[in-house]
Swiss-Prot record:
InterPro entries: Kinesin-like_fam, Kinesin_motor_CS, Kinesin_motor_dom, Kinesin_motor_dom_sf, NACK_C, P-loop_NTPase
Gene name of the encoded protein: KIN7F
Record bears the keyword Kinase: no
Binding site for ATP: G120, Q121, T122, S123, S124, G125, K126, T127
Protein name: Kinesin-like protein KIN-7F
Cited Gene3D superfamilies: Kinesin motor domain (3.40.850.10)
Coiled coil: 365-437
Role: Binds ATP/ADP in vitro. Possesses low ATPase activity but high affinity for microtubules.
PANTHER family attached to this UniProt entry: CENTROMERE PROTEIN E, KINESIN-LIKE PROTEIN KIN-7F
Polar residues compositional bias, start-end: 495-512, 560-587
A GO biological-process term: microtubule-based movement
C-alpha cells in the first residue's frame, strides 16, 4: 500500500449538500493541512441550575467564545478564544456533525485516513456527541455506497478500549489484554484484534451496541454514567472497480476512519472519587496529559522528541496526530462557573491542537487482476514489436523527423516575426521623417552634391537620404569631428521637383531628422583656404574607411565629390540646389567619356600626396597619448568657436536631443575622441591586449584582494567604478586593433566608436538585443565559473536601459576572451587561470554564502527559503543545498532573478534603484586614463574566473 497522485484516483461525484469527498491527495507528498478544531458548549445541567451555578462562557459568533469574567489567579489569561467553529448550547448534534466533522470523516471513501476526536472534562457531553457523529457518518457512507454501484466496497469494523493502560477488544467476550506491535508498513497495530466484515448498516448498529455494553462505565459525583476508559471505533473501507476500466481505475483504495471517545479529565476534589474510581482517574489524567504534551510539541514545529510511546493512547493514535490522516477534534465544555478552570484548560488544549499540521495521502493497493491485465497488455505490445521491427523503427524515425521539422518551423517562425517587427519599426521611422514627400535617391545623381554651398550667415536645413557614398562626403566635410549635427532641408511643395534625387538599396538608406545649425561668417573663406592645403590628408582618411564598404571606384567618386564641394571658392551665400547648374552638370557628365572622368579624378587626388606623409608622422608621434592626434588641416580649424563647442560636446555624454536623434546613419556614427593608431599598433592582437590587462589586474589583486568570506562586501559605488575602468580598458584595446582587424569587417560600427548611440537608434530593437546579450552573458558566467557576487551586481544594475549597451558589450567581450582562455588551457604567465581553479573559488564563495545565511536570515526566513528552493526541511546541510542551487539554471530567467535577489540579500546589496541612479551619473567617454588602485576589487578576482 502506498501513496499516489490525485490524477490516479478515481474522481468521484459530489455528495449531497455540495461536499466534495475526494481528498485530492497531492501525490506522494500528500496534502498539508491543519487539524479542524471545534468547541461545543453544553447547556447547564439540572444539578448546576439547582445550585445556582451561573454560566461564565458565551459564544459571540460562530468562531469565537469569550469568558464573562476574568480569572482571579491569572489576570493575564486571555478571555476570548477563536477556533474553526464554535457551537452554542442550543445546537444539535447533526449541525455539529455537518459543520465540524462531515468533510473530514467522509474523506475515507476517497482513500484518505481520518479521525474524529471528542475531548473535554468529565460530564461535558463527549460520549453523547460521539455517538451521534458515528451514526451520521456511517449513514452517509452507506448512502454514498448505494450511489456508486460501479465500485465494490468492503467495510470492516473493529473496536478497542484503553482501561487503566490496558488494551481490550470490545468485540470479544474474552477479557484478555492485547499487545501493541510496530510494523514498517502497517505502523502500530493491536495483536489479535477482532475485525468483522459488515453486511449492512443494521449489522454495524448491532456491533456498536455490543461495544457500548462492553465498555467500562461508572458513577461519579459529577456524572451518573461516566466513561472510565478511552474508546476507539475503527471502520476500514476497501473499494475497487467491479470491472477493468483502464489503468487509472484499476487500483484498490484502502482507508480507515477512527471514532475516538476519550474519557474526561477530572479532579478528585470535585468528583469525590476514591478507591477504584481514584485509580481510574489517575490513569485517565495521565494519558490525557501525554496527549496534551504531544499536541503542544507538534504545534511548535520543532524537530524535538515527541513522546508518543509514553502512553498507549498516543501510540495508537500517532498516525492521526500529525501523520497520514485528516483529523477533527471536537472539544466539549461546561459553561458553569464551578468548572471554569477545567474549561480554560480544555480551550488551551484546543488552541494548541489547531496549530498541528497533518499530511494526508491517498492509500492505494494495486489489485492482482489489474496487474495481470496490465502485464498482458505490455506483453502483447512487445510481441508485436518483435514480429514487425522494421515498421516500428520506420514509424519511430518518421515521428522524430516530424518533430525536427516542427522545431525547425517554429524557429523559422520566430525569426520571421523578429524580422517583421524590425521592418515595421524601420518603416515607422522612415515615415516619420519623410512624411508626405517620397524621396528617391539615386547613386548616379550623388555627384550633384558638389552644387551644395554653405549658407554662412544663415541657418541651413537639408533633408537627405544618406548612402554609403554620401557618408564619405559627410566624413570629409566634418573633418572627423564627432557629434556634428546633421543639417536638413525641409522640402516645400514648390521645391519638390528641384531637389536632388538619389536611389540606393533601402538597407543603406537612413533619413535624418531636421536640425538647424549656425556657421561663422568667415567659414566659406576659411574652408576654401584649408581645402587645398590638407585635402590629400582628408582623402586618405576617407579611402581607409570606404575601401571595405563600397569598393575602390565608389571611394574615388565620393572623394572627388567631397573635395569639389570643399574646393569651390565661389560658393554662394545660401545652401541650395541650382536647377540650371545641376542640369548643365548632368549634361556635361553625359558628354564626358570614362577616360576623361578617370583623368579628372586622378587630378583631384594628386594634390593630397604631401598631406598623407604629415598624417602618418603625426599619428606615429601621438600613438602613446590618449587623445586623438589631428592632421594639420584639423588643427587649423580648432581655433574657431564652433570647433571648441564640438570639443566640449565630444568629452561629455550626448545631451537629450542628441540621444533622441534616431535618424543618424549606422555607418556615420559619432566617433570616439581617441581614434589614433599607427603602424606599430596594428601588430597588437585582441588576445594579447586583453591578456596583458588581465595580467595587470591579477598582479593588483594579489596584493590587495582578501579571501571572500567573513569580510564586508564592496559597495555598489565601487562596483560601478570597476565597470567604468573595464569600459576604459576595453576602449583602449579597441583602439589597438582598429587599424587592421575591425576596419576589415567593412563597417565603422565594428570599430566600437559609440555603441550607446547605436543602441539608441532603434528603441524597438534594443529590448530584443538586450535579452539576447543578457542570455549570452549568463551562459558565459556559468561556463567560466564567474563569481556569484559579480553576477548579482551586474544583473541587478543593468535591466534593459538603452544606455546600458556599453556595459553589456564590455562584459560580453571580457567573458568571451575568458572562455577562449580556459578552452586553451591555463596560461603560464598568469597563475590560477584554469577552469578547475575558478571552480574551486566558486565553491568557496558558495560556502561563504552558507555562512551569510546563518548570520543574516532568521530561522523562519531560512525555513521559507528552503521550501522555496525545494530543499526538504528534514534533510541535512540545507544551507549548502540552497547555495549549490544558486545560478545553476541559466535558461530560466526567473531562477536567475531569484538567485540574484537571494545573493543580494545575503551580501547586503543596496536597493537596485539606488544603484541605477548612481550608474546614470557615469560618463564612459574616453578620457585621461589613470590606473586606480585595486582595493575596491576585493571580489574582482572571482569575477575574472
Amino acid at each position: 500500500m502506498g501513496a499516489i497522485g490525485g490524477d490516479e484516483v478515481v474522481q468521484w461525484d459530489k455528495m449531497d449538500g455540495g461536499e466534495v469527498v475526494n481528498g485530492g491527495g497531492g501525490g506522494g507528498v500528500g496534502k498539508l493541512e491543519r487539524i479542524l478544531v471545534s468547541v461545543r458548549l453544553r447547556p447547564l445541567s439540572d444539578k448546576e441550575i439547582a445550585r445556582g451555578d451561573p454560566s461564565e462562557w458565551e459564544c459571540i459568533n460562530d468562531t469565537t467564545i469569550i469568558s464573562r469574567s476574568t480569572f482571579p489567579d491569572r489576570p493575564s489569561a486571555p478571555t476570548a478564544y477563536s477556533f474553526d467553529r464554535v457551537f452554542r448550547s442550543d445546537c444539535d448534534t447533526n449541525e455539529v456533525y455537518k459543520q465540524g466533522a462531515k468533510e473530514v470523516a467522509l474523506s475515507v471513501v476517497s482513500g484518505i485516513n481520518s479521525s474524529i476526536f471528542a475531548y473535554g472534562q468529565t460530564s461535558s457531553g463527549k460520549t453523547y456527541t460521539m455517538t451521534g457523529i458515528t451514526e451520521y457518518t456511517v449513514a452517509d457512507i452507506y448512502d454514498y455506497i448505494g450511489k456508486h454501484e460501479e465500485r465494490a466496497f468492503v467495510l470492516k469494523f473493529s473496536a478497542i478500549e484503553i482501561y487503566n493502560e490496558v488494551v481490550r477488544d470490545l468485540l470479544s467476550a474474552e477479557n484478555t489484554p492485547l499487545r501493541l506491535w510496530d510494523d514498517a508498513e502497517k505502523g502500530t497495530y493491536v495483536e489479535n484484534l477482532t475485525e468483522v466484515v459488515l453486511r449492512d448498516w443494521n449489522h454495524l448498529k448491532e456491533l456498536i451496541s455490543v461495544c457500548e455494553a462492553q465498555r467500562k462505565t461508572g458513577e461519579t459525583y459529577l456524572n451518573e454514567n461516566s466513561s472510565r476508559s478511552h474508546q476507539i471505533l475503527k471502520l476500514t473501507i476497501e473499494s475497487s472497480a467491479r470491472e477493468f476500466l483502464g489503468k487509472d481505475k484499476s487500483t484498490t483504495l484502502v482507508a480507515s476512519v477512527n471514532f475516538v471517545d476519550l474519557a474526561g479529565s477530572e479532579r478528585a476534589s470535585q468528583a469525590l472519587s476514591a478507591g477504584a474510581r481514584l485509580k481510574e482517574g489517575c490513569h485517565i489524567n495521565r494519558s490525557l496529559l501525554t496527549l496534551g504534551t504531544v499536541i503542544r510539541k507538534l504545534s511548535k514545529v520543532r524537530n524535538g522528541h515527541i513522546p508518543y510511546r509514553d502512553s498507549k493512547l498516543t501510540r495508537i493514535l500517532q498516525p492521526s496526530l500529525g501523520g497520514n490522516a485528516r483529523t477533527a477534534i471536537i472539544c466539549t465544555m461546561s459553561p458553569a462557573r464551578s468548572h471554569m478552570e477545567q474549561s480554560r484548560n480544555t480551550l488551551l488544549f484546543a488552541s494548541c491542537a489547531k496549530e498541528v499540521v497533518t499530511n494526508a495521502q491517498v492509500n492505494v493497493v494495486m489489485s492482482d487482476k489489474a496487474l495481470v491485465k496490465q502485464l498482458q497488455k505490455e506483453l502483447a505490445r512487445l510481441e508485436s514489436e518483435l514480429r514487425c521491427p522494421a515498421s516500428y523503427s520506420s514509424l519511430e524515425s518518421l515521428v522524430k523527423e516530424k518533430d525536427n521539422q516542427i522545431r525547425k518551423m517554429e524557429k523559422e517562425i520566430k525569426e520571421l516575426k523578429l524580422q517583421r517587427d524590425l521592418a515595421q519599426s524601420r518603416l515607422q521611422d522612415l515615415l516619420q521623417v519623410v512624411g508626405d514627400n517620397h524621396v528617391h535617391v539615386s547613386k548616379q545623381s550623388s555627384v550633384s552634391g558638389r552644387n551644395f554651398t554653405f549658407d554662412v550667415p544663415q541657418t541651413c536645413e537639408d533633408e537627405q537620404s544618406t548612402t554609403e557614398s554620401s557618408e564619405v562626403v559627410d566624413s570629409v566635410q566634418n573633418f572627423r569631428f564627432q557629434g556634428r549635427r546633421v543639417a536638413q532641408r525641409e522640402h516645400k511643395p514648390q521645391q519638390a521637383e528641384n531637389n536632388v534625387q538619389f536611389t540606393t538599396p533601402s538597407r543603406y538608406s537612413v533619413s535624418s531628422p531636421p536640425f538647424s545649425g549656425m556657421l561663422p561668417t568667415n567659414r566659406s573663406d576659411h574652408l576654401s583656404q584649408i581645402s587645398n592645403e590638407d585635402s590629400d590628408d582628408i582623402c586618405k582618411e576617407v579611402r581607409c574607411i570606404e575601401t571595405n564598404e563600397t569598393g575602390g571606384n565608389e571611394c574615388l567618386e565620393s572623394s572627388a565629390v567631397g573635395s569639389n564641394s570643399l574646393q569651390d571658392p565661389n560658393a554662394g551665400s545660401s545652401m541650395h540646389i541650382n536647377n540650371d547648374s545641376n542640369s548643365s552638370m548632368n549634361s556635361r557628365l553625359r558628354d564626358e567619356s570614362p577616360v576623361t572622368l578617370e583623368q579628372h579624378l586622378e587630378n583631384v587626388r594628386k594634390p593630397f600626396a604631401n598631406i598623407v606623409k604629415d598624417l602618418g608622422s603625426s599619428t606615429r608621434n601621438s600613438s602613446s597619448s590618449k587623445v586623438l592626434g589631428r592632421s594639420r588641416s584639423c588643427r587649423s580649424l580648432t581655433g574657431s568657436s564652433l570647433f571648441e563647442d564640438l570639443e566640449k560636446d565630444d568629452c561629455t555624454p550626448p545631451n537629450r536631443s542628441f540621444i533622441d536623434f534616431a535618424g543618424r546613419p549606422q555607418n556615420c556614427q559619432r566617433r570616439g575622441s581617441a581614434l589614433n593608431y599607427d603602424a606599430e599598433s596594428e601588430t597588437l592582437s585582441r588576445a594579447g591586449s586583453m591578456l596583458s590587462e588581465i595580467t595587470t589586474t591579477r598582479d593588483g589583486l594579489k596584493a590587495n584582494s582578501s579571501v571572500a568570506g567573513d569580510t564586508e562586501f564592496t559597495g555598489i559605488g565601487e562596483f560601478v567604478a570597476e565597470l567604468k575602468e573595464m569600459a576604459q580598458v576595453q576602449y583602449q584595446k579597441q583602439l589597438g586593433h582598429s587599424g587592421n582587424g575591425d576596419l576589415a569587417e567593412g563597417t565603422i560600427r565594428s570599430v566600437g566608436l559609440d555603441p550607446i548611440t547605436d543602441a539608441l537608434q532603434s528603441p524597438s530593437r534594443w529590448p530584443l538585443e538586450f535579452e539576447k546579450k543578457q542570455q549570452e552573458i549568463i551562459d558565459f558566467w556559468h561556463a567560466c565559473n564567474v563569481s556569484l557576487v559579480h553576477r548579482t551586481y551586474f544583473f541587478l544594475l543593468f535591466k534593459g536601459d538603452p544606455a546600458d549597451s556599453i556595459y553589456m558589450e564590455v562584459e560580453l567581450r571580457r567573458l568571451s576572451f575568458l572562455k577562449d582562455t580556459y578552452s586553451n588551457g591555463a596560461i603560464a604567465s598568469i597563475p590560477n587561470t584554469s577552469l578547475v581553479s575558478s571552480a574551486k573559488k566558486l565553491q568557496r564563495e558558495r560556502e561563504m554564502l552558507c555562512r551569510q545565511m546563518q548570520r543574516r536570515l532568521s530561522i523562519e526566513e531560512r525555513e521559507s527559503m528552503y521550501t522555496k528552493w525545494g530543499v526538504s526541511l528534514a534533510s541535512k546541510r540545507r544551507r549548502l543545498q540552497v547555495a549549490r542551487c544558486l545560478w545553476t539554471e541559466t535558461k530560466d530567467l526567473e531562477h536567475v532573478r531569484e538567485s540574484a535577489s537571494l545573493v543580494a540579500r545575503l551580501i547586503g546589496l543596496l536597493e537596485p534603484g539606488k544603484a541605477l541612479r548612481e550608474m546614470f551619473g557615469l560618463s564612459f567617454a574616453p578620457q585621461q586614463f589613470t590606473r586606480r588602485s585595486y582595493n575596491s576589487w576585493r571580489y574582482g578576482r572571482s569575477s575574472l574566473n
